[in-house]
Amino acid sequence: MAMYLGLDVSDKTTHLCVVDEAGVIGWRGVCATDPETIAKTIARHCDDVGRVVLETGALSAFLYHGLAERGVPVVCICARHAKGVLSARVNKSDPHDAEGLAQLARTGWFRQVHIKDSATHLDRARLKVREQLVRAHGAMRNQLRGLLKLFGLRLGSATTPAKRVERLQALFGQRPELEAVLVPLVTSLAALEAQSAASSRELKRRAAADPVCARLMTVPGVGPVNAMTFKASVEDPGRFARGEDVGAFAGLVPRRFQSGERDTKGRISKAGDAMLRHALYEAANSLLARVKRDCALRRWGLALAQTKGAKRARVAVARKLAALLHTLWRTETSFRWA
């Protein structure tokens, strides 16, 4: 008889629950959150494993790949979907959640989540590191400007590190007591700037060497970071039957509420991959605001901005870009200007 397991994962321990085909609990337990330990625990208590279910979370990719490599038929499901079932219980606890996940594994009433491979997660880590460096650099630069303004000093348009150092030396000449106070901030800012630039160069190099990214970058407004983000987020274009589905995956489609005679559409869901959504929005903004060469997509977006507003136009163009990039990737073709 096939047995079904639910894994409620926390940072140090994982609660397990085993149910049979009738939903009767066969065993409960807890073990360390480690693929080897979990696999051995499952083998010790289950002879015939039908399906093992765990929720999405910080450790889900690590556990999924570790269990799959050890021959465990593991499935990862969306935590937001599982919450609707697990929240029906009056009392919330880790053992109860493991039991609920085991029942979901038995019934098959869930939507499986695609787990990216290690190479893709490495690319996403590179993108995240660059994003954090850019944000930290911007915040520190604004902090420096704000502190100088407290004393009536203005940094001005110091666009390069050399110009900023030159300008700061002039300002410290006016208020010498500020130099000792602000030197740690200035030094940290320079280090962040160097690391951010190095990270951007590495991403550009990798994007230029990647055939898929090079093809995606033929689309106006799509740069190396946008292309790498799209590739690392979608990973496999065959996951989506239509290009329009990528926009929904990125959370760029409006929410819908239909009941009886009422059928309304709200704001975009923002329920998908936030990194991909931001990259598509940035590419759309670049296409509408910075690209000078005319094309059909740009004309359509600018016309929409005249009637619906700039923000809605950017979102609409971002949806179009998602479908376009997916099509170019799937068909292995480059962008043709029209």
Feature annotation, model-predicted:
Residues 1-338:
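A detector of single, family-specific signature residues
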